[in-house]
């Protein structure tokens, strides 16, 4: 490729030639030009360059090769130092095939880590530096120290504690009733295969599923001593059991049947294969994975500064004048010239409007409209709450065309929203902001209520300053000195003077209000009563804190002080109530701190269950440094599994401008506190990058060639060294305990859907058949809704198991990893209902009505006595998914997104529609039934007998019990879905979507009424199942996907 020709990313991913001609610029001014392998790493290229440079002029002026570093211009047109010389040229993908060698400056280790972090989080750390934002700089310094101290503490852990951090236990839910649910396996004998680390010899033992890991290890040590005729000197306490071929360990005082791996083996009839690992090996791993020598740089001791006079400041509460701002002008406004421009401004505390909105005068449309207008709000400066935000909406107005027969003289005007922006009135140090501000605005999107202002939106300006519309405002100086919000001591001092009223009749009214209207809007007189009885709420109804906070007058500083004084002595809340306080409706920082304090009692498993929502709630935070961020980072640095998923939840949204800064800073902090895990994550990132390039290649190739030809070219591409290296020997992003060892190229393929998802298969020699793992890589589909749905199904599974009800669910892994990209776990040994029916039928038109197809397929996969167990698995899982899909309102159910495993477990896939957002055609709802319960399902449940009502009634009982259990936890689902509104999912954007859950769980009814409601839906699903079969017939005929 000649100099001056740009190299788009496609050039580096296409393998037209193994080499590329690169221009090299040496520090001496010498220019060299020669071909190098695109697969070569920078270290190799530097060696070749040095060999050639010795024959060029001025070579004697060059220092040692290690004194120089390559730079290039990257795909975003930025000059980039290539500190990591193990990276390949094809992975770097410079914009031009030009590499410049420059003298290395600064600390190489530090620069290398910074380079790796930048690559990993998808944002250069120099971008954070260039902001010159004091809040960003203070946050980075504080979080770096926080995370590196956590890393230093981790290096001092004993081997068991370090094992708990690196390989957290994977246990089945253990609670009341669940132990009883395990009794049927607890009494069984279990064959376990155990070998010792570094030895090929293995022993098979028969143990009880009630035995602890220590008992199994003691048995193995005795066997080893007997076989090799050695004295028994080693103790089982010095060992842990590793699952072969996985990053998963068994340890601690738990019966074997409580470990997920053992339970999985029991259900599938496989023999567990374990390796005994000595504590010295685990300590060696700890030392190898420790952070490099502490990066916390303690500043040199300096002589104490000369005492300075404390700058004068003014308390906000001493200023009683009305709050006002000056609207100066707009910039880069784009609107129809026939319209008029208006700015609306409002003061908000969460969703609550603190006073009436104010609007500017109308001005003619132009690129830079000028107002120079004072906007005064109906609130005193002293009453501004700490978390008050000033919200702006820029919109155009146009007179609606008057109808011919209209007799109205006054013409109506229509609003056309253009952009919005939000600004916190106080900075992160509690100081009231003053002076001129330029607010870069975000484009407006239609709102269901037609609201112009967006108080829940980000308070960060649009980073696209080159083209974004902007407002210039002036915040006046309200005092001769800086104005600060009062410190907590001053707040409490004022708050303790609040009155306390107590009347017996009012106590009864209070109880009735909190119980009757626990989740609805209160009338004004009810709000007044709840506030008046706030001390009684604290004493007798502490879980109603959210209700009290909502009635607090946040535009009256005396009431705010009394509320916060009460909060200081409020009893710690249960997790459910604390989760509710993280919603945008409760922005106060002291309330947030109290909520996090209540959440600290969460176990790691519970925290992991809610992690997705907690990450989304970060978007509501007004400042970078907040309790929620520190809480998540602290737990992530104490549990690598939590750290893994925290990273990917953040990384998957780095393309969203409104959160890229916050999420990038949190990831940077995490990486500095876990540099070894950073390398693991980088390996995953490299694999995902290769899969995206491979998918792009397949999409283009499939348009030109047949599927077999494209598949063969896909395999050729995968066999290249760079692909094999990137795609092999990594931890699965879907589950870090799963190792993706050797990629099985011949078994890899792509699917026929529009986005051509890749189907990638792996094998592991050490794990045997259990090491066969498949992943699906999707590029072009938004997987966030699938991930949320599967999270809820997994939560349902946990809640059921805690009540002793194991419905054999299959909540397979699903993880978005970037902008419309992500991974899905392959559920092996399974097939779709459509394929089973089509393969058992002669015609696609009759396949949907072949009621024997499913049962015959199960018989072929489960001969003899195994069939009864398979039918039981089908019955349990069918009950679970009937209830789950009904409660979640999952739509678009057809025979291609319902699957069955060979073991009998039924499960659903592809959750593109939920919460009752069903597909329609020609205005007609295509979803005719509450959930899928067809007669061929019933045929399997009844074991192929038409009069086996006992089996069917047992199935109905499973459904009713499962539904009743979910109802008891209804508020948990409501809170979790409410918090997920921050994600911006199209089908979870308004209160109507949440209302669907309230209706499906019948939360406004008694348990007896709710059960009656569910029975009506159950009978309807069974009665109307013929409509489902008609839909399936149409689906099968239109897409005869027989395989």
Curated annotation (Swiss-Prot):
Modified residues (Phosphoserine): 1038
Main location: cytoplasm
UniProt KW keywords: Adaptive immunity, ATP-binding, Chemotaxis, Cytoplasm, Differentiation, Immunity, Inflammatory response, Innate immunity, Kinase, Lipid metabolism, Nucleotide-binding, Phosphoprotein, Transferase
Start and end residues of each PI3K-RBD domain: 187-278
Disruption phenotype: Null mutants are viable and fertile but display defective adaptive and innate immune responses due to signaling defects in multiple cell types including B-, T- and mast and natural killer cells.
Record note on quaternary structure: Heterodimer of a catalytic subunit PIK3CD and a p85 regulatory subunit (PIK3R1, PIK3R2 or PIK3R3). Interacts with ERAS and HRAS.
Gene Ontology process terms (BP): adaptive immune response; B cell activation; B cell homeostasis; cell differentiation; cell surface receptor signaling pathway; chemotaxis; defense response to fungus; homeostasis of number of cells
Metabolic or biological pathway, per its Swiss-Prot or TrEMBL entry: Phospholipid metabolism; phosphatidylinositol phosphate biosynthesis
MF terms in GO: 1-phosphatidylinositol-3-kinase activity; 1-phosphatidylinositol-4,5-bisphosphate 3-kinase activity; ATP binding
The organism's place on the tree of life at top rank: Eukaryota
Residue span(s) of domain PIK helical: 496-673
Catalytic activity: a 1,2-diacyl-sn-glycero-3-phospho-(1D-myo-inositol-4,5-bisphosphate) + ATP = a 1,2-diacyl-sn-glycero-3-phospho-(1D-myo-inositol-3,4,5-trisphosphate) + ADP + H(+); a 1,2-diacyl-sn-glycero-3-phospho-(1D-myo-inositol) + ATP = a 1,2-diacyl-sn-glycero-3-phospho-(1D-myo-inositol-3-phosphate) + ADP + H(+); 1-octadecanoyl-2-(5Z,8Z,11Z,14Z)-eicosatetraenoyl-sn-glycero-3-phospho-1D-myo-inositol 4,5-bisphosphate + ATP = 1-octadecanoyl-2-(5Z,8Z,11Z,14Z-eicosatetraenoyl)-sn-glycero-3-phospho-(1D-myo-inositol 3,4,5-triphosphate) + ADP + H(+)
Domain PI3K/PI4K catalytic: 744-1026
Consequence when changing residue 910 to A: Inhibits lipid kinase activity. Mice are viable and fertile but display defective adaptive and innate immune responses Signaling defects in B-cells, T-cells, mast cells and natural killer cells. Reduced B and T-cell receptor signaling
PROSITE patterns: C2_PI3K, PI3_4_KINASE_1, PI3_4_KINASE_2, PI3_4_KINASE_3, PI3K_ABD, PI3K_RBD, PIK_HELICAL
Modified positions (Phosphotyrosine) in chain numbering: 523
Free-text tissue specificity from the UniProt record: Abundantly expressed in adult mouse spleen as well as in testis. Isoform 1 is expressed in spleen and lung (at protein level). Isoform 1 is expressed predominantly in leukocytes.
Protein name: Phosphatidylinositol 4,5-bisphosphate 3-kinase catalytic subunit delta isoform
Domain C2 PI3K-type: from-to ranges: 319-476
Chain residue ranges for the region called G-loop: 750-756
């Amino acid at each position: 490729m000649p100099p001056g020709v740009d190299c788009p990313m496609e050039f580096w991913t296409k393998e037209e030639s193994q080499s590329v001609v690169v221009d090299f610029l040496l520090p001496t001014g010498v220019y060299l030009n020669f071909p190098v392998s695109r697969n070569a790493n920078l270290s190799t290229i530097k060696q070749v360059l040095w060999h050639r440079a010795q024959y060029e002029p001025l070579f004697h002026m060059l220092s040692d090769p290690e004194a120089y570093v390559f730079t290039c211009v990257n795909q975003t047109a930025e000059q980039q130092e290539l500190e990591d010389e193990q990276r390949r040229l094809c992975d770097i993908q410079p914009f031009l095939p030009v590499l410049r060698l420059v003298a290395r400056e600064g600390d190489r280790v530090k620069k290398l880590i910074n380079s790796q972090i930048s690559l990993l989080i998808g944002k250069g750390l120099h971008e954070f530096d260039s902001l010159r934002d004091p809040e960003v700089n203070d946050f980075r310094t504080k979080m770096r120290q926080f995370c590196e101290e956590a890393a230093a503490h981790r290096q001092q852990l004993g081997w068991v504690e370090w094992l708990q951090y690196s390989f957290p236990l994977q246990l089945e839910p253990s609670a009341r009733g669940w132990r009883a649910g395990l009794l049927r396996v607890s009494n069984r004998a279990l064959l376990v295969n155990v070998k010792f680390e570094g030895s090929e010899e293995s022993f098979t033992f028969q143990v009880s599923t009630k035995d602890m890991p220590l008992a199994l290890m003691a048995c193995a040590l005795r066997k080893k001593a007997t076989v090799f005729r050695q004295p028994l000197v080693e103790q089982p306490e010095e060992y842990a059991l590793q699952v072969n071929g996985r990053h998963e360990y068994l340890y601690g005082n738990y019966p074997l049947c409580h470990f997920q791996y053992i339970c999985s083996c029991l259900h599938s009839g496989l023999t567990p294969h374990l390796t005994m690992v000595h504590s010295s090996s685990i300590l060696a791993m700890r030392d190898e994975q420790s952070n490099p020598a502490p990066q916390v740089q303690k500043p040199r001791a300096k002589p104490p500064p000369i005492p300075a006079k404390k700058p004068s400041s003014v308390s906000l509460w001493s200023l009683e004048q009305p709050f006002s701002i000056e609207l100066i002008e707009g910039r880069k406004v784009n609107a129809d010239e026939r319209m008029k421009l208006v700015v609306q401004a409002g003061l908000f505390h969460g969703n609550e409007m603190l006073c009436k909105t104010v609007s500017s005068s109308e001005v003619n449309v132009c690129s830079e409209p000028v107002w120079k207008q004072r906007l005064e709000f109906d609130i005193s400066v002293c009453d501004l709450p700490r978390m008050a935000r000033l919200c702006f909406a820029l919109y155009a107005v146009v007179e609606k065309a008057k109808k011919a027969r209209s007799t109205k003289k006054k013409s109506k005007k229509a609003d056309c929203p253009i952009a919005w922006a939000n600004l916190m009135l106080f900075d992160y140090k509690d100081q009231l902001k003053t002076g001129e501000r330029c607010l870069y605005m975000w484009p407006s999107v239609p709102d269901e209520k037609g609201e112009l202002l967006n108080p829940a939106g980000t308070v960060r300006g649009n980073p696209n300053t080159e083209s974004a519309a902007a407002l210039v405002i002036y915040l006046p100086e309200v005092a001769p000195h800086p104005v600060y919000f009062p410190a907590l001591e001053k707040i409490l001092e004022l708050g303790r003077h609040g009155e306390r009223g107590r009347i017996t009749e009012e106590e009864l009214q209070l109880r009735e209000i909190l119980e009757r209207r626990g989740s609805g809007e209160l009338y004004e007189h009810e709000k007044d009563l709840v506030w008046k009885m706030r001390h009684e709420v604290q004493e007798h109804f502490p879980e109603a804190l959210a209700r009290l906070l909502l009635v607090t007058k946040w535009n009256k500083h005396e009431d705010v002080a009394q509320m916060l004084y009460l909060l200081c002595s409020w009893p710690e809340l249960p997790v459910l109530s604390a989760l509710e306080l993280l919603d945008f409706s409760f922005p106060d920082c002291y309330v947030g701190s109290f909520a996090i304090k209540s959440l600290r009692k969460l176990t790691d498993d519970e925290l992991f269950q809610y992690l997705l929502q907690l990450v989304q709630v970060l978007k509501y935070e007004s400042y970078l440094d907040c309790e929620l961020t520190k809480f998540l980072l602290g737990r992530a640095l104490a549990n690598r599994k939590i750290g893994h998923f925290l990273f990917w939840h953040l990384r998957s949204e780095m393309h969203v401008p409104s959160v890229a800064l916050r999420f990038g800073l949190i990831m940077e902090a995490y990486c500095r506190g876990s540099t070894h895990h950073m390398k693991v994550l980088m390996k995953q990132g490299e694999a995902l990058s290769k899969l995206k390039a491979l998918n792009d290649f397949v999409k283009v190739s499939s348009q030109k060639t047949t599927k077999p030809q494209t598949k063969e070219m896909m395999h050729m591409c995968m066999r290249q060294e760079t692909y094999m290296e990137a795609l092999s020997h990594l931890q699965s992003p879907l589950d870090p305990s799963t190792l993706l060892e050797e990629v099985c190229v011949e078994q890899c393929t792509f699917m026929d859907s529009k986005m051509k998802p890749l189907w990638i298969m792996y094998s592991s020699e050490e794990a045997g058949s259990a090491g066969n793992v498949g992943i699906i890589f999707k590029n072009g589909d938004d997987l966030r809704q699938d991930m949320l749905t599967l999270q809820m199904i997994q939560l349902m599974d946990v809640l059921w198991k805690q009540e002793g009800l194991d419905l054999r669910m299959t909540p397979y892994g699903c993880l978005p990893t970037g902008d419309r990209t992500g991974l899905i776990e392959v559920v092996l040994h399974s097939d779709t209902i459509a394929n089973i029916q089509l393969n058992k039928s002669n015609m696609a038109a009759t396949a949907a009505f072949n009621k024997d197809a499913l049962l015959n397929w199960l018989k072929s996969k489960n001969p003899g006595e195994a069939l009864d167990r398979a039918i039981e698995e089908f019955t349990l899982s069918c009950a679970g998914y009937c209830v789950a899909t009904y409660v979640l309102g999952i739509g678009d159910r057809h025979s291609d997104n319902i699957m069955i495993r060979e073991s009998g477990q039924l499960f659903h896939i592809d959750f593109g529609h939920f919460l009752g957002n069903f597909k329609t055609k020609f205005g007609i709802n295509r979803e005719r039934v509450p959930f899928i319960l067809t007669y061929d399902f019933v045929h399997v449940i009844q074991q192929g007998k038409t009069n086996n009502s006992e089996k069917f009634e047992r199935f109905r009982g499973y459904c009713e019990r499962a539904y009743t259990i979910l109802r008891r936890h209804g508020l948990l689902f409501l809170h979790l879905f409410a918090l997920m509104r921050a994600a911006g999912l199209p089908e979870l954007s308004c209160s109507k979507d949440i209302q669907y859950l309230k209706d499906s769980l019948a939360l406004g009814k008694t348990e007896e009424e709710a059960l009656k409601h569910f029975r009506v839906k159950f009978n309807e699903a069974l009665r109307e199942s013929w409509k489902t079969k008609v839909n399936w017939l149409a689906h099968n005929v239109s897409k005869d996907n027989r395989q």
